[in-house]
A protein has these predicted regions:
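Positively charged n-region of N-terminal signal peptides that target proteins for export
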Residues: 1-6
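Bacterial N-terminal signal peptides
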Residues: 7-16
Length: 157
């Protein structure tokens, strides 16, 4: 679990240091980060309240629904069954509103994958629960990607 928290913090830090060119502040975007390290896979999702506020009259209610949906990680993403990944740990944290970030949700999961070389992408399912046009992604160490509903994958290359 300590590995999950450490890598999650590092990935959030990296996303904040290097937003994609022409993109808004990462605190205003839904983000997903994934890192493969040997047979371990770490996935982190950040959902700021500002990313959903314009899409509903009650952003806190929408965040409550999203947080409940994330109890099953497959609501947010899925993994190729051939990789043989099993969930080792997961955390979903509701962030309190602060002037610099505005609050939201931070979620992270750690998997052990029997055949991690078979894992070429993380399939993103978030578009079905969050009405957004894109997600900022980071596949570590490959780099940043913008993920759209018509090609909802965070690709490892």
């Amino acid at each position: 679990m300590n590995i999950l928290k450490s890598v999650t913090l590092i990935m959030v830090f990296l996303l904040n240091l290097a937003p994609a060119a022409g993109q808004v502040n990462p605190f205003e975007r839904v983000t997903i980060s994934a890192a493969k390290a040997g047979q371990n896979l770490l996935v982190n999702i950040g959902i700021p309240v500002s990313a959903v506020a314009a899409r509903t009259d009650n952003p806190e209610e929408l965040l409550d629904a999203i947080q409940s949906a994330l109890d099953d990680y497959r609501t947010a993403f899925s993994l190729d069954e051939a990789a043989g990944c099993r969930l080792e740990a997961g955390d979903i944290i509701r962030l309190s509103s602060k002037p610099d970030t505005g609050g939201g949700i931070s979620a992270g999961w750690e998997f052990f994958c029997e055949n991690s070389q078979s894992l070429s992408a993380v399939d993103i399912n978030l578009f079905s629960i969050i009405p957004i046009s894109s997600i900022e992604g980071l596949a570590f160490p490959e780099g940043q990607q913008v993920i759209y509903p018509d090609l909802p994958k965070l690709v490892f290359e």
